[in-house]
A protein has these predicted regions:
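Flexible, acidic/glycine-enriched loop-and-adjacent beta/alpha segments
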Residues: 22-73, 125-141
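Short capping/connector residues at structural and topological boundaries
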Residues: 14, 26, 47-48, 53, ...
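Preference for short coil/turn "hinge" residues that link or interrupt alpha-helices
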Residues: 5, 14, 19, 41, ...
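Surface-exposed beta-strand edges and their flanking turn/coil or helix-capping segments
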Residues: 14-16, 24-27, 68, 169-171, ...
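Non-catalytic, structured segments within soluble enzyme domains
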Residues: 73-226
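Terminal hydrophobic membrane-targeting helix
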Residues: 1-29
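Short, solvent-exposed loop/turn elements at domain surfaces
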Residues: 8-11, 42-44, 165
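Acidic/histidine-rich, surface-exposed loop or edge segments in extracytoplasmic proteins
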Residues: 10-20, 35-37, 56, 76, ...
Length: 226
């Protein structure tokens, strides 16, 4: 809370911490990591990938085959902000129609920037729920989104799949146990491999970054007293 002159009255604990930023304030490392992992055809499709949609729809609604890997970043954005994730044909159809419409109304950079500004990224070092890449960068590594290194970007890009599980921090802001930290670290290595697989990283860089110790970059816990 602030006075009219913008001086601080007090800090208020919020249920969700989010700091929207412009696309040019987000590191290309994050953008490449997200595209490589979540939607490698992002630049070429028009909102949906028909074969992937059919496979995922049959998996999630009818229980046939796999339910993963069918949603583009555009669909994920619609799912997060508009239609939810109920496993019904009606919901999936609405998601597809809205994704196609969104691609006609926004360019790729706008869609990617919006996705990165609203997606959930788990918890920060105070145990607060965070959304958006800027809050994630500040709350996990203590840097701005534009300054994230490749390993840091890979870690953050992997979080939206399962934000609380992969977050390095517990609900009280403390660092998780070594065993539980490994879940997010393994996910980050998967992201790095996807970056290599799709050509975003050379083999040499992939091997170097895969050996990097991300735990030394996590900022110290600063839990909020309840």
């Amino acid at each position: 809370l602030t006075y009219s002159d913008k001086s601080l009255i007090a800090e208020v604990d919020s249920d969700l911490i989010r700091t929207p930023v412009a696309g040019d304030a987000i590191s290309d490392n994050v953008k490449k990591a997200v595209i490589a992992t979540e939607d490698e055809n992002f630049e070429s499709h028009k909102g949906v990938v028909p074969k992937a949609v059919l496979r995922a729809t049959l998996g999630s609604v009818a229980g046939v085959g796999s339910s993963s890997g069918g949603s583009t970043l555009t669909q994920q954005l619609i799912k997060q902000q508009v239609v939810g994730d109920a496993p019904t044909f009606t919901r999936k159809a609405t998601e597809i129609v809205d994704a196609l419409a969104l691609e006609r109304g926004m360019d790729k950079n706008e869609i990617l920037t919006t996705y990165l500004n609203v997606s959930p990224f788990g918890r920060n070092n105070r145990g607060q729920n965070i959304a958006g890449v800027e809050a994630a960068a500040q709350g996990i590594f203590g840097v701005s989104a534009k300054d994230l290194t490749v390993p840091q970007a890979a870690f953050i890009a992997g979080l939206p799949q399962s934000p609380i599980v992969y977050s390095p921090y517990a609900a009280d802001g403390s660092l998780k146990s070594k065993e539980n930290l490994e879940l997010g670290l393994a996910r980050a290595k998967d992201v790095l491999f996807n970056m290599y697989r799709t050509g975003a990283l050379s083999k040499k860089d992939y091997e170097t970054y895969a050996q990097y110790d991300l735990t030394k970059d996590f900022i110290a816990p600063d839990g909020i007293e309840k």
